[in-house]
């Protein structure tokens, strides 16, 4: 797959790369990976297996460790909580019950607290996962494969704006991150000037990838 090849090449160039594949929610709600034989949301995340979740997430491009990061990183959790409050009028709480970590949510205006179940809240799980890895400084390069999945265009645009705030080359500015976005959504095409066209590759079936070279722009 293109995303895995890209991850390999970037790793060889000494970037600390995190891939979030198009199937990143697997392990939360699917059984397509042998280790995740049942939903990790219905019963919670086994606290004794946190390191295993992280390793599998890194290996397969899964977002399973997102809630673990939120549990371990108060600074990131505070950011996510503030955004959930502003965007969705909801709060999130990470509860430890019987050796398992269970994320639970509640509407700000009242109502009972509820768990994030495997067959619902797709958009909520996506935005929480994407933002968590965006804010996590463990990696300085992230590949987002189809970040638009389950996201309303409004939140696609919001997420792109969050990416813009920290996008750059970490080898030049240590607090920046390098981003690669594989997408079918026009809301993730970040074109503000003709020079920005240099940053876009267009993939075709049975044809070579096309892109605009710097010399092409200079001619115009």
Predicted region positions:
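Coupling/switch segment of ABC-type P-loop NTPase heads
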Residues: 2-88
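Short, well-ordered coil/turn elements that cap or connect secondary structure elements
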Residues: 12-14, 89, 174, 194-195
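A short, flexible N-terminal coil/short beta segment enriched in small residues
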Residues: 86-89, 181-183
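A short linear hydrophobic-aromatic micro-motif
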Residues: 90-94
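Switch/communication elements of ASCE P-loop NTPase nucleotide-binding domains
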Residues: 96-220
């Amino acid at each position: 797959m293109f995303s895995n090849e890209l991850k390999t090449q970037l790793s060889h160039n000494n970037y600390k790369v995190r891939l979030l594949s198009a199937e990143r929610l697997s392990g939360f709600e699917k059984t397509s990976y042998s280790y995740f034989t049942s939903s990790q949301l219905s019963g919670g995340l086994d606290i004794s297996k946190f390191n295993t979740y992280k390793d599998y997430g890194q290996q397969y491009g899964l977002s399973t460790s997102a809630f673990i990061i939120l549990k371990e990183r108060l600074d990131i959790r505070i950011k996510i909580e503030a955004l959930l409050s502003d965007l969705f009028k909801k709060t999130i709480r990470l509860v430890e019950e019987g050796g398992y970590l269970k994320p639970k949510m509640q509407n700000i205006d009242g109502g009972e607290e509820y768990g994030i179940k495997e067959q619902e809240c797709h958009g909520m799980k996506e935005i929480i996962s994407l933002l968590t890895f965006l804010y996590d400084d463990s990696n300085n390069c992230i590949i987002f494969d189809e970040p638009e999945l389950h996201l309303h265009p409004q939140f696609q645009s919001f997420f792109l704006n969050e990416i813009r705030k920290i996008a750059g080359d970490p080898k030049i500015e240590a607090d920046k991150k390098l981003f690669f976005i594989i997408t079918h959504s026009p809301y993730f095409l970040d074109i503000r000037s003709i020079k920005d066209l240099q940053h876009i590759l267009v993939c075709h079936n049975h044809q070579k990838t096309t892109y605009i070279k710097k010399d092409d722009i200079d001619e115009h």
